[in-house]
Amino acid sequence: MYQPDFPPVPFRLGLYPVVDSVVWIERLLQAGVKTLQLRIKDKCDEDVEPDVANAIKLGRRYGARLFINDYWQLAIQHQAYGVHLGQEDLETTDLSAIRNAGLRLGVSTHDDMEIDVALAARPSYIALGHVFPTQTKQMPSAPQGLEQLTRHIERLADYPTVAIGGISLERVPAVLKTGVGSVAVVSAITQAADWQVATAQLLQLAGAGDE
């Protein structure tokens, strides 16, 4: 049963772009995206704070669900919609501070054991990846594929889920057939020949999520 220890999110978050700049955040909000994540890696809080603050302001202006990857203290300080954490961050993050601030929490997983860890934290949603090979980041595990993703979705039937990793426009229909509630994309938008066309096509397939 879906009883998160954090504020809930819609069962279907729809298209969920993960981008590394405020420029992309604003572009995608203007294009009608309602769920998105700012993922800036390997910078100190002081350097990244202006971007985090501006992204959160934009998300609020557009009524969007903006998640901040990793920088949970800044997310709390600037009142983001939510925070997304990797498995390695769960042990070093003050989850109660995120909860008490009223922020949603998303957690990455790559296998059954990590799903167990995520469920123990009772987050708002669980991300499942990486589904296909990806060049976006170095991955310690092998791609899960659609069969494994389907099995995880069956296990998490009443939990909001997000599929991520190597998902191109052409692969979205097959990914959605697994029953996953959201499709996270990176290069399918940021490396597209025409990002506006790609975003519109992805929104048509995956939707903007439930209200």
From Swiss-Prot:
UniProt binding sites for Mg(2+): D70, D89
Taxonomic superkingdom: Bacteria
Pfam assignment, any one: TMP-TENI
Catalytic activity: 2-[(2R,5Z)-2-carboxy-4-methylthiazol-5(2H)-ylidene]ethyl phosphate + 4-amino-2-methyl-5-(diphosphooxymethyl)pyrimidine + 2 H(+) = thiamine phosphate + CO2 + diphosphate; 2-(2-carboxy-4-methylthiazol-5-yl)ethyl phosphate + 4-amino-2-methyl-5-(diphosphooxymethyl)pyrimidine + 2 H(+) = thiamine phosphate + CO2 + diphosphate; 4-methyl-5-(2-phosphooxyethyl)-thiazole + 4-amino-2-methyl-5-(diphosphooxymethyl)pyrimidine + H(+) = thiamine phosphate + diphosphate
Residues that, per the record, bind 4-amino-2-methyl-5-(diphosphooxymethyl)pyrimidine: Q37, L38, R39, I40, K41, N69, S108, K137
Biological pathway: Cofactor biosynthesis; thiamine diphosphate biosynthesis; thiamine phosphate from 4-amino-2-methyl-5-diphosphomethylpyrimidine and 4-methyl-5-(2-phosphoethyl)-thiazole: step 1/1
Family matches, as InterPro entries: Aldolase_TIM (IPR013785), ThiamineP_synth_sf (IPR036206), ThiamineP_synth_TenI (IPR022998), TMP_synthase (IPR034291)
Family indicated by similarity: Belongs to the thiamine-phosphate synthase family.
Name of this chain's protein: Thiamine-phosphate synthase
Species this protein is from: Enterobacter sp. (strain 638)
Gene name linked to the record: thiE
